[in-house]
């Protein structure tokens, strides 16, 4: 799985998978993010950039929920930015739109994490 990790100036770790998050790669995504959680305390927030994704399956959703809990345990913030209407539908159907900080605009997500 191709994933870009970028540490932004504001203490934000941006994690951007370049392919859909499915059973084929959700475990790899989860492991990579868990490894980034071991980084120094200079990181205070995480941004999952899903703008290249068109689809999430149940394994992808499970990974997101697990990582959300892990990030919360560390008293850090998580925002998710996406563009796909299909992904929005998944978040709404699973009611994750009530649990997660979701954005369809990259700048809004960054602003939320920078506050």
Feature map (PLM): residue ranges:
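STAS-typified acidic loop motif
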Residues: 3-31, 50
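Amphipathic alpha-helical interaction surfaces in cytosolic regulatory modules
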Residues: 23-99
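Residues at or immediately preceding the N-termini of alpha-helices
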Residues: 26, 106-107
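Acidic phosphotransfer microenvironment of two-component signaling modules
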Residues: 85, 107-108
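Short acidic-hydrophobic, aromatic-tinged amphipathic segments that line or gate anion-handling sites
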Residues: 101-105
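A short, charged, amphipathic alpha-helix used as a generic interaction element across diverse proteins
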Residues: 114-115
């Amino acid at each position: 799985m191709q994933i870009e990790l970028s540490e932004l100036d504001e203490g934000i770790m941006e994690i951007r998978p370049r392919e859909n998050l499915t059973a084929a790669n959700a475990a790899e995504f989860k492991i990579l993010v868990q490894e980034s959680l071991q980084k120094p305390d200079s990181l205070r927030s995480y941004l999952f950039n899903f703008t290249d994704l068109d689809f999430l399956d149940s394994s992808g959703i499970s990974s997101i929920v697990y990582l959300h809990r892990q990030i919360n345990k560390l008293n850090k913030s998580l925002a998710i930015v996406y563009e796909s209407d299909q992904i929005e539908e998944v978040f709404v159907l699973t009611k994750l739109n009530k649990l997660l900080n979701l954005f369809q605009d990259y700048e809004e997500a960054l602003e939320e994490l920078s506050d």
